[in-house]
Amino acid sequence: HGVEYFFLSPEEFRQRIADGEFLEYEEVYPDRFYGTLKAQVERQLEAGQHVIFDVDVVGGCNIKEYYGNRALSIFIQPPSIEELRHRLEGRGTDTPEVIQQRLDKAEYELSFSPKFDKIIVNDDLETAKAETLEVIKHFLSIAKNSIKQNLLHSK
């Protein structure tokens, strides 16, 4: 899927943060960073590629702030916290403590949803996938028309 990983030492990662080279980043554990380099994204965009990110809410807000209306931000949320609890408990893979941590994080993340362009409620997976696809298609058609208009006006 065109995913490339670059492994940097914690010191080099911190230096690149200080130099403003990251579009978004997060220190997920002490000295364990993940992030997206601006230069890599720009190379992909210049090559005519569409770039899709699966990032946390802060990363999503940072990307949207950087690219403005050249980016589409989608927030996918559960129908409710109670439904999320039910789903997590139904998996039978996490302890009650881990489930509570995930629910607390979900509540925190939900507070960011108004900052996104589109909120999709994942009540039914197939419906949510179809709605997401339609939102993306609509956004890309608007972007394509905008590029055409810019070309016409530049002549």
Tell me the role of every PLM-derived stretch.
Residues G90-D94, Y108-K155:
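NTP-dependent small-molecule kinase module
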